[in-house]
Amino acid sequence: MDSNTVSSFQDILMRMSKMQLGSSSEDLNGMITQFESLRLYRDSLGEAVMRMGDLHSLQNRNGKWREQLSQKFEEIRWLIEEVRHRLKITENSFEQITFMQALQLLLEVEQEIRTFSFQLI
């Protein structure tokens, strides 16, 4: 993972944690938690791809990795829809910018995970 992506994740997570969205703050905290979990998963897939032969240890360690991968794609789709919804309802420009950047980053991460998974298949 390149340093720009790391800083993008850190920047968006920091800005999202500063937002006050009233009654939906629990939902936002859940989004932040899922975002962080997604980043860690993407990083671990990327590391597995970097180490040739890790495919076999990944498959041995986790016989259900395809199922796990499918679940992560569902999480990404949910987060994308949630971010799009937040983007539509917010009128605060700081929040709009943050959610637009989060959406762009989610789409990039989805593509990276797809690329990693194709290399692992």
Curated annotation (Swiss-Prot):
Keywords carried by this UniProt record: Host nucleus, Host-virus interaction, Transport, Virion
Organism: Influenza A virus (strain A/Chicken/Victoria/1/1985 H7N7)
Lineage, top ranks: Viruses, Riboviria, Orthornavirae, Negarnaviricota, Polyploviricotina
Keyword Oxidoreductase attached: no
Record-given protein name: Nuclear export protein
Role description: Mediates the nuclear export of encapsidated genomic RNAs (ribonucleoproteins, RNPs). Acts as an adapter between viral RNPs complexes and the nuclear export machinery of the cell. Possesses no intrinsic RNA-binding activity, but includes a C-terminal M1-binding domain. This domain is believed to allow recognition of RNPs bound to the protein M1.
Subunit structure comment from the entry: Interacts with protein M1. May interact with host nucleoporin RAB/HRB and exportin XPO1/CRM1.
Main localisation: virion
Gene: NS
Family: Belongs to the influenza viruses NEP family.
Domain of life: Viruses
GO BP terms: exit of virus from host cell nucleus through nuclear pore
Compartments (UniProt record): Virion; Host nucleus
Gene3D superfamilies referenced in this protein's UniProt entry, alphabetically: 1.10.287.230, S15/NS1, RNA-binding (1.10.287.10)
GO cellular component: host cell nucleus; virion component
Record-linked InterPro entries: Flu_NS2
Motif (Nuclear export signal): 12-21, 85-94
